[in-house]
């Protein structure tokens, strides 16, 4: 907490995947940890705004595991204790810990089954949170197996869970839009050109990839391959994004008012590297304070959307920066201070209304 205060901040997002992992730690330790954090944060005037867990994102299928017992364990022994910790600290419970197995992506019927499983899991999470006075915030991702990865998915999930169970919100990450542009539905012309040039092209499910390779090897004609691929892909809408799904600013306009946490990272929209906002990284990146604030404001100006929960009256802009294990502590703190300094140019004090922040952009 001393480092956070030295950076000029008094709001913290705790990572549950370092000091208080729910599967590696017993309940006694978790209670001791949360009690000590609550005590020290109160003494120092620090607000624990959110608790976040994403440790399982790339190591387990988690909430949508193919095994029912594994799914239940992830829910009841990972997420529920995580929510309990957040409740003790009066914090938002942020999370992402699931993925669809490739077999589900390759079978539309199986995909629908696992999507239902996910919605049921999310519903149980939403209810558990509501009973404990905790706001849940699911992080949006950027590939077909990581639902929700498209704007339409996020809206469908928020509406479906909020209507049937209890309010559900999402976390928008400013670097989680680069992947969608790699999963666009190919046109006939793109297929023909790629076959002719012997190049690479994302064509959707595995059966289409095999057809594409057969065409490149000359086993079938390019026209036949294009016909078959386009026909098959009609049954696999879950494997394709719209180009606008890679637009960070559209995500913020469409869904920012339902995102209690916005994870900030600098990016060139070619990777989710979680860079900071130093002058060097800003020179290579596309994320700016002005774009973030204007996009959020434009979203609040839109009419309320039927089926969505009430727009939020508070959003935490949260630096989520990653560093190499060989980066020194001093260099990390230096980069953190530079990043905080950059964002303080746009948000000089916490709690300033969004419309005032946007108005101030014109006089900077």
Regions found by a protein language model. Name each.
Residues 1-88, 123, 130, 217, ...:
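N-terminal pre-domain/capping segments
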Residues 44-46, 91, 134, 301-303, ...:
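A short helix->loop->beta-strand "cap" motif at the edges of active sites that frequently abuts
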Residues 2-8, 148-364:
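Histidine-acidic metal/acid-base catalytic patches
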Residues 11-13, 50, 94-95, 137, ...:
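Conserved beta-strand positions in the central sheet of alpha/beta enzyme cores
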């Amino acid at each position: 907490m001393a480092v956070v205060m030295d950076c000029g901040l008094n709001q913290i997002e705790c990572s549950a995947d370092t000091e208080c992992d729910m599967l590696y730690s017993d309940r006694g330790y978790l209670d001791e940890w949360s009690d000590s954090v609550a005590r020290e944060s109160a003494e120092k005037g620090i607000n624990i705004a959110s608790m976040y867990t994403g440790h399982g994102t790339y190591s387990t299928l988690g909430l949508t595991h193919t095994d029912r017992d594994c799914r239940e364990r992830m829910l009841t022994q990972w997420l529920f204790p995580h929510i309990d910790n957040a409740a003790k600290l009066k914090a938002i419970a942020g999370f992402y810990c699931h993925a669809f197995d490739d077999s589900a992506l390759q079978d539309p019927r199986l995909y629908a089954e696992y999507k239902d499983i996910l919605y049921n899991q999310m519903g149980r999470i939403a209810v558990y949170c509501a009973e404990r006075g905790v706001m849940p915030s699911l992080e949006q991702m950027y590939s077909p197996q990581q639902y929700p990865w498209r704007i339409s998915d996020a809206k469908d999930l928020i509406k479906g869970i909020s209507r049937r169970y209890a309010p559900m919100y999402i976390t928008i990450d400013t670097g989680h839009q680069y992947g969608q542009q790699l999963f666009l539905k190919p046109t006939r012309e793109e297929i023909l050109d790629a076959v002719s040039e012997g190049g690479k092209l994302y064509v959707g499910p595995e059966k289409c990839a095999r057809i594409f390779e057969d065409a490149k090897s000359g086993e079938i004609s390019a026209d036949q391959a294009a016909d078959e691929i386009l026909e098959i892909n009609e049954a696999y809408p879950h494997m394709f994004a719209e180009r606008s799904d890679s637009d960070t600013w559209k995500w913020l306009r469409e869904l920012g008012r339902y995102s209690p946490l916005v994870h900030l990272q600098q990016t060139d929209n070619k990777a989710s590297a979680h860079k900071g906002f130093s002058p060097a990284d800003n020179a290579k990146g596309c994320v700016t304070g002005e774009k973030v604030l204007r996009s959020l404001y434009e979203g609040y100006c839109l009419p309320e959307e039927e089926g969505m929960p009430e727009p939020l009256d508070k959003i935490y802009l949260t630096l989520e920066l990653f560093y190499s294990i060989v980066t020194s502590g001093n260099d990390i703190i230096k980069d953190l201070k530079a990043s905080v300094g950059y964002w303080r140019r746009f948000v000089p004090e916490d709690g300033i209304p969004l419309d005032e922040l946007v108005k101030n952009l014109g006089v900077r």
